[in-house]
From Swiss-Prot:
InterPro entries: Actin (IPR004000), Actin/actin-like_CS (IPR020902), Actin_CS (IPR004001), ATPase_NBD (IPR043129). It is found in: Cytoplasm, Cytoskeleton. The keyword Nucleotide-binding applies. GO terms for cellular component: cytoplasm; cytoskeleton. The lineage of its organism: Eukaryota, Sar, Stramenopiles, Ochrophyta, PX clade. Keywords: ATP-binding, Cytoplasm, Cytoskeleton, Hydrolase, Nucleotide-binding. Belongs to the actin family. This is Actin.
Length: 331
């Protein structure tokens, strides 16, 4: 082992050396499962990417809906004790996405790499009893596409090759408005086919895989999951809410996260929800162009509000009360 090798690589650097590394993800289904690795990522973020001293800046962290209490405390503890931040706050990702879209009431479908949630939010507060969690997100779609391509005779097996498939997914797939009709079209002509050049120069052609891959979100049975599709999860979430606010939720369905970036997803959601909801209900699905980063954008909006400044948990408050203060100040 040469002197120039580190014991761990994070982020883009790990991606660029992925051929000789084993890639690990400290977050599973939106919940942190490996705190040592998570700390490495935070350290890398502060010192190598942002190049800031964490002890000089308040930190706003985001969390998955229904994040376990112990996790919230651990997050708080690491920020204050390891990174010595002067102040911090924790907020739910979906709520921040809604702020980014300029709303305080609506139903957010937030879907990232490991987990999807449908979260109803009224006047800035998430309604926990009605949140639906679906353990079907970006990574599952990538895995499914790997499998489908393997059936076609292309072999993708290593963690490095998974990243190639993820790139294919991000560049070429889309959601069909009518899946069966699209399958017919794909069978009858080659107009839906697209080619992709692999890093070694080989070219692969993908056809109906382009829309079969994200269709799993609407029909999880495709990969043997018994859960409801994202349209059904959204409908169930709204139905668990008070009848008086349903109209506001139906009229403000906001998509957020990288796994809502598929072209056609907004139109398909509108179509599916129109079929489920009362016929007189006005349904509006909003897919903001910046939705891949809307959680971050919402966080930057929140943290810059003058009214938010008294919400921070300060180092002094933490020293006095310990990690459990996070439940009293962030809800």
């Amino acid at each position: 082992v040469g002197m120039d090798q580190k014991d761990a690589y994070v982020g883009d650097e790990a991606q660029s050396k992925r051929g000789v590394l084993t890639l690990k993800y400290p977050i599973e289904h939106g919940i942190v499962t490996n705190w040592d690795d998570m700390e490495k990522i935070w350290h890398h973020t502060f010192y190598n990417e942002l190049r800031v001293a964490p002890e000089e800046h308040p930190v706003l962290l985001t969390e998955a809906p229904l994040n376990p209490k112990a996790n919230k405390e651990r997050m708080t503890q690491i920020m204050f004790e390891t990174f010595n931040v002067p102040a911090m706050y924790v907020n739910i990702q979906a709520v921040l996405s809604l702020y980014a879209s300029g709303r305080t009431t609506g139903c957010v479908l937030d879907s990232g790499d490991g987990v999807s949630h449908t979260v109803p939010i009224y006047e800035g507060y998430a309604l926990p009893h009605a949140i639906n969690r679906l353990d079907l997100a970006g990574r599952d779609l990538t895995d499914n596409l790997m499998k489908v391509l393997t059936e076609r005779g292309y072999s993708f097996t290593t963690t490095a090759e998974r990243e190639i498939v993820r790139d294919i997914k991000e560049k070429l797939t889309y959601v069909a408005l009518d899946f069966d009709q699209e399958m017919k079209t794909a069978a009858e002509s080659s107009q839906l086919e697209k080619s992709y050049e692999l890093p070694d120069g080989n070219v692969i052609v993908i056809g109906n895989e382009r829309f079969r891959c994200p269709e799993v979100r609407f029909q999880p049975s495709f990969i043997g999951m018994e859960s409801s599709g994202i349209h059904d999860c959204t409908f169930k979430t709204i139905m668990k809410c008070d009848v008086d606010i349903r109209k506001d939720l139906y009229g403000n369905i906001v998509l957020s996260g990288g796994t809502t970036m598929f072209p056609g997803i907004g139109e398909r959601m509108t179509k599916e929800l129109t079929a489920l909801a009362p016929s007189t209900m006005k349904i509006k699905v909003v897919a903001p162009p910046e939705r891949k980063y809307s959680v971050w954008i919402g966080g930057s909006i929140l943290a810059s509000l003058s009214t938010f400044q008294q919400m921070w948990i300060s180092k002094a408050e933490y020293d006095e009360s310990g990690p459990s203060i996070v439940h009293r100040k962030c809800f």
